Amino acid sequence: MALDYTKAFDSVNFQFIYKTFKHFGFGDNFQKWIKTIFNGGKSCVANNGYLSEKFEIHRSTRQGDPISPLIFIMGLEILFITLRADKNIRGVKIEKNEIKLTAYADDASYFLRDKISAENLLQKNELSSKISGLEVNRSKSECLILSFELDWGENSGTFLGIPITENLKVLGHFYGKSQIVCNYQNFYSKLEKIKKILSIWKQRNLTLIGKNLLINSLASSLFIFNTQIEYPPSDFIKLVEKLHKDFLWAGVPKIAHNTVIANFKKGGINYRDLNCFIDSINVKFLQQITGSHNYNHHALPNLWLKQLFKIPTSAAREPYFYNFFENILNLLDCKIKVPRLRYFKGHPFYYKILKTAEVLFQKDCAKIENFLSIPIWFNRILKTKFDTEISKAGFNFIKDVFPENQQIAQFNGLRNVKIRKLKSIRDKVPPIWQNKIVNSRSSFVTVIPDQIINLQDKDYNFKDITSKQIYQQLIEKKNTTTCRVIKLV
């Protein structure tokens, strides 16, 4: 359910604002400044060239004022705290997380389990409006029903005055029951706009670099935001690329695609490869779900990843792969082998991200210190699955399975079957890895928990790399042919 608040910024009551600041513990001096800003404000109405007499304002946060959105968000948070604590409003439960709402400024979306919860939500909003001044505009709000529960009012087309829709637009992206309709709204409807923009500029006598700049700044920007929520259909990408190339070459391409996507030093023009560009942006989402914060929008991806790699939910704490039995293990360190798509029960968006990460993390670390911290679990080279007993005994990283670490000689009371499994894991370590370890004088004690990625023979912390670096790496992997230097006119 997406609720629209009537004249959101203009409705907030001043007294409610002051009490909100006091509730959140702002100091007396700060509260006085806020009162100074809002108290005694006057305004007038411009009508047909004439100004009315000035009158005193008792509510609203001025639009355009830098502090207004922050104050509005604080006022709305009071309502959200009440809704989250209300047991009569039941949200969607994902493992231990119950998600009731998400919000961005005045755009609030609610995820409700049943009809009673929806009724209680609207009732709470009505009560809140008497205090804060924020009223729900039911005619502009929308409701998407995914339940089999009867009597929602589908026949009348409304639920308690809120229109029932088949597709819901949230922050510029459509969600709904029909994937075909959503794909059209999110992607295919943009084709005509792209064609119109390029046809206007086609009349100009532009260079290749100028045309490429227009493609990147004006044409691609129309749909890139949507691709960060779900991957576009493959035929949509083909249609967009056809429009781009028709504009760039005014007909049949004169130079191979792998050449023009290269940088200037390699004879290209930095033409954007859409698939690689989208992958480079989206793979950075892994920086969030494998980080130290646990947000509601990470709940589903974490659940799907556990199911994909058959991780027992009781053993894993959020975020995924973090602090397993007091050992730091991370998905990106494991040189994972991503199972086939048919085993993935979640949204294809996250599976595609994992496949991109698999490509990026193929290359071995350059430094031995980083190499020793690679986990032995879910390792596509060692072909291992997670073993609770062995992990609890302290065997989790490459450094743990070699004689230099006296721990393996003691085996920490492991059963014979587990000892044999541990030795078989050690035997699977490639000779080139073993040589690095034998010839290294590095300490076998220190473990670097950060996710290390090797780009152009240099080790980087994954959380610090940019989309541009990832894009260049993907292009380098894709473009294996030697680029010819072309003369740009």
How should each PLM-predicted stretch be described?
Residues 1-8, 34, 60-64, 68, ...:
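Catalytic palm active-site di-aspartate
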Residues 117-132, 191-196:
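Inter-domain linker/hinge segments that demarcate the starts of reverse transcriptase
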Residues 159-232, 252, 283-290:
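Basic, alpha-helical interaction scaffolds
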Residues 74-105:
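Active-site palm subdomain of RNA-directed nucleic acid polymerases
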Residues 5-11, 23, 60-72, 93-95, ...:
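Conserved, non-catalytic sequence blocks in retroelement Pol enzymes and Pol-derived host proteins
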Residues 49-51, 121, 136-168:
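Short, conserved micro-motifs composed of acidic
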Residues 1-78, 244, 489:
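Conserved pre-catalytic core of RNA-dependent polymerases
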Residues 240, 253-489:
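Extended C-terminal regions of large enzymes
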